[in-house]
Amino acid sequence: MSALEELITKAKALQAEGHTPGQISDELGLSMETVTWLLTQQKGMEAPKDVHIDWAAVGSHGVLLNDMAMMMLKRFLYLEEGGDVRAIEDLPDTVVGIAPSGAPLATLIAAEEGLKLAVYLPAKHSRSEAPTGSLSGTFSAIAAQRCIIVDDVVTTGTTLSETIAFLRQHGATPVAVWSLFDKRGAREIDGVPVHSLFVISRLG
């Protein structure tokens, strides 16, 4: 079975389990456009230009996941493009993890630095007729907080734009986006700087 056939099989299996296209997009690290194609593709149709990132070997192991979270933290503190090293005091008040994959990373970062933790539930996970994003009531409020947004993969930037807008509408100030992988090559999204560990580029 080819890699593409495996993705089609995985996408259809997740759909059969009741996952929404948005949830499948997060599970497979693919754009919504690609997921739609995987679920509906017909022979002869050209696949969207996308890159599948499978980091389950790291995400499924607590110690390795913590290592990745600490790399994200150090990327922000010690590898600033201008050459300056940030102080721990420069960290904002709250770490906002985008569910599902950004939440465990955000938890580890918040625990390491003694910061507040919030979890954002994006609109694409909602099953309502008019889907909207929301903040989990179990974790920190964000009003008047300076926030870092954490996610695993930047694909199109749509979910991050949604999160940034939500935070601003609710009185918070998003100061940075941290991600493991950036498939868009974004330096900023809606005026918020993006700090990624790895940037994925297609040639040609």
Swiss-Prot record:
One of its GO terms (biological process) is pyrimidine nucleobase biosynthetic process. InterPro entries: GfcR-like, PRibTrfase_dom, PRTase-like. Transmembrane segments: none annotated. The keyword Amino-acid biosynthesis does not apply. It holds the Pfam family Pribosyltran. Coiled coil: none annotated. GO terms for molecular function: DNA binding; orotate phosphoribosyltransferase activity. Keywords: DNA-binding, Transcription, Transcription regulation. NCBIfam families: PRK02277.1. Belongs to the purine/pyrimidine phosphoribosyltransferase family. GfcR subfamily. Contains an N-terminal DNA-binding winged helix-turn-helix domain and a C-terminal regulatory domain (or effector binding domain) resembling phosphoribosyltransferase (PRT) domain. This is Transcriptional regulator GfcR. The lineage of its organism: Archaea, Methanobacteriati, Methanobacteriota, Stenosarchaea group, Methanomicrobia.
